[in-house]
Amino acid sequence: MLQRAASNAYSWWAASHIRTKQSKWLEQSLHDMQGRVESVIKLIEEDGDSFAKRAEMYYKKRPELINFVEESYRAYRALAERYDHLSKELQTANNTIATIFPEQIQLAMDEEDEYGAPKMPKDFLQMPASGSNIPKVPPKAPIKDLKGLMSTASKQKQGKQSSKIEDAAKSGLSKNEAIEEIDKLQKDILALQTMKEFIRSSYQSSLEKFRGLENQIMEKQQKICELEDEFGEGRVIEDAEACTLMAEAALQSCQETVTQLQEKQESYTQEAREEFKKIEDACNKLNSFRHKYLGDQIDEAKVYISPIQEVDKEIESLQEKIKDQIDATSKGSLTMSQLAEKIDELVNKVVSLETAVSSQTLLLERFRAEADELQAQVQTLEDDKAALTDTHNLNIRVTAIEAKLQNIENLNKDVVNQNSCLRTHFVEARANIDHLSDKLSSVQPDEEIDGTDSSPDQVIALAEIKLEEESLKQKDHPSSAEGLKNLSTIKAEGPKNLSTIKTEGPKSLSTIKAEGPKNLSTIKAEGPKNLSTIKTEGPKSLSTIETEVPKNLSTIKTEDKEVRKQQGSSTVVSDKKTTMKHVTFAQPTPAEKGDEKVSAQSGNTSVYETHTQKSAEKDDELNWQQMLLSGLDDKENILLNEYTAILKNYKEVTKKLSDIEKKDRDTEFELTLQTRELKSAIAKRDEEIHNLRQKLSLMQQGNASENKALKEELLDPSDPSSARGLKPEDLPQIKDGDDEEDVKTILVDQRATVSPLEGKLRMSIDAILDENLDFWLRFSSAFHQIQKFKTTVHDLQNEISKARDKEMQGNSPRVDVKSEIRPLYKHMKEIQNELTVWLEQTLSLKDELERRFSALCSIQEEISKGLKEEVEDETTFSSHQAAKFQGEVLNMKHENKKVREELEAGISRVTILQEDVEKTVTQLDQEFGLTGNQSQLMQSVSKSRIPLQSFIFGTKPKKEKRSLFSRMNPNRKF
């Protein structure tokens, strides 16, 4: 709910603009109709001077006029059919919008007559004798109040009872049974009609309240916009503050709704007590009457008395325990997401309470009707003095009244049970509202708090509270003594069973603990739900549980979860198809008792439920069999529980999916950061390597120059004093091999020096290669268009030949052929223009190929010139490098030649295609005169413009020309 409110928080204005554009079909139809009208007018304008010419006009041109009328009728019919189709689609769209967004549609909820649709007048289907054939709108069904509805229902009941049913054997019932069944169904219908009226009134009031709130929101938003426009400043509410405000509003609304529901429930309880007093009075009268006239022949009738005081005391104790347990289970702070989930659960619970309170109205109305009928029967029995003499008939009537009294007692039990359930849910809702209101001030963001583990004591306490709720509901059934014994047994054995579940194995405990806080928080969140019965399902599900408790009190309805052991020690909790299952607590085996102490000290609980697919299918079959045997009410409850469980599973899967997507986004972001860091580190390392290589090259050059100077100085023959006392062995031994090895060891990874000519050639070749991508893209797109042009022209020529064949065979007149040829002619002209543009574009490709060829030739000349000349630098341009460059250039020239050949072939094909298109266009123009019509239309458009002279100086009045229609009928005066 909070997410919907947040998503709609800023969507105050909604503007939808429906722009219509003219359909090509409509435009073509209008154009064709205009041409046909012009041709028919020309045909009509012709005058017949002689009898022969008039006869020719009659016999020759009359079929053309008839054909024109038929074609006009067909065109109008097609237009009407399209309009009808669009009207149906629009009606369907309106119904769909009204179904999906009922709050946007003004609903006129007219009351229905009796139990079905409103009655139509007798003359509704009769067509009027004259005038339009449109039927009149039927009058609105008469609106009746609740009393009138009840009176008509009772009258109909009496009328149907008085009628004779001849075919009673078809239903398999006797006459008396059929009358009883009709009576029961009539009462059910009356109760449902009452419920419908109540829901309708509540819906209308809720709808008015909704619209009022929407108007207030719009007014406040408009005021905000005005203030922002006036002062030029705005304020944005922070996310935390907005969430807090929405949570406070939701809690306040829930609290007000619960208060109103409690007041209604108290009033209903008071009414039920008054009706119960009436039943007690009737029972006392019946007992006194029986003692007076029948003696001790029949046992006294006993009235079921509801233990209201005991229920009140137990509800007070339950309220205190619920508050203590809620405080114990949530000692830490709540995150914003946890708070939103809890508020959503609370809102769903309040909505279910509203439905339960409204259903209590139906039950109370039925209880009141039964009590009134019982009083009437007792009073009739007392007033009928003639029947007092006949003891046999008197016994029969008293027995019938006692059976009626027994039914009323059962109905009273249902009222008391529903009352206790509602009070229990009210207590729980109040406690949750108070708890969330207290936690609202200490809400933290989602990242600042982790889920904590739930202790076994808390789980046991939750189970005890729920078992007390079951006992509270079962105490209202005095006939279920055996069920209460089983309930007390389960209540006493509850902690033992929980400890048994807790001792299912330390391996699964350690494994689930190793899975991380996510699995633990999931188990913590789902644990109380599984241990407690479904409290949020509403009174219907609670009443279903009440009927099932005496049969199987040791079973608990939970979601289907499996714990499978993988690799000896790992357990995986997997959600499967959510079904209604009965899971019994396992008893500890002797082998497991040794591990009980270890698992008790761990402080965590492990959910261990193993169900195979076969057992799931059996449980499903049992549920459906139970649903069919239990009747309509239990079937609805079971279906409601099934739907709620599926919806809960869907929410969990959606939450897990969002968590996985969030993890994927985080992982992708981390990988992006790591990639950036690696790129920066690699760039720094490359820069350092480059600097070190430069330093090494400088050091090598310096050492070589020093060694050379030292040799020259020592071996200089012009200085005799320097070589006087020196011997050859005293000179430093400098070996070329050692120097080469030193250079190789130092410059292992150093790149070879590049000559200027080699660098220049490499730059030229790289420039040509860089242009290859753009060139190939343009060439491929141009080459691809050739096949497209060829296919289009071929299709158009086929269509033109088909139209000509129709004209030759005489199947269609020339006007229709001309209307079919016109769009083909336009398309052919467009293709002709596109072919011209394509040829112009290919000229640039040819120029670029020539430029690339000349560039490659110049590179070849530079390579040959570099081999002949000697380079003055230390490094020379070797023949190996020249051969390498020469091979690259030759490959590029070969590719260039192939591309030029393909381009020339494509140009020749397009040129032939262009000639064919021009020839076809010329033939169409000569045959049908399509260019002339376009020039006439252009002239008519130009004539309709106002000249500048007339616009400035005005126009002189001219003589009126005779219109086209006056020429058609010259004798008629306008």
Swiss-Prot record:
User: Keyword Coiled coil on this protein?
Assistant: yes
Give the gene that encodes this protein: KIP1
Function summary: Probably involved in the receptor-like kinase-mediated signal transduction pathway.
Q: Please quote what the entry notes about the protein's domains.
A: The NAB domain is capable to bind actin filaments.
Q: Which GO terms describe its cellular component?
A: cytoplasm
Coiled-coil annotated spans: 173-423, 641-697, 784-807, 882-905
Q: Which residues form the NAB domain?
A: 10-90
The subunit field of the Swiss-Prot or TrEMBL record says: Homodimer or homooligomer. Interacts with PRK1.
In terms of Pfam families, this protein maps to: KIP1, NET2A, NET2A_C
The organism of origin for this protein: Petunia integrifolia (Violet-flowered petunia)
Provide the GO MF annotations for this entry: actin binding
Question: Where does the record place Basic and acidic residues bias?
Answer: 726-736
Q: Where is the composition biased (Polar residues)?
A: 599-610
Question: What is this protein's record name?
Answer: Kinase-interacting protein 1
* Tissue expression per record: Expressed in mature pollen grains and pollen tubes, but not in style, ovary, petal, leaf, root or sepal.
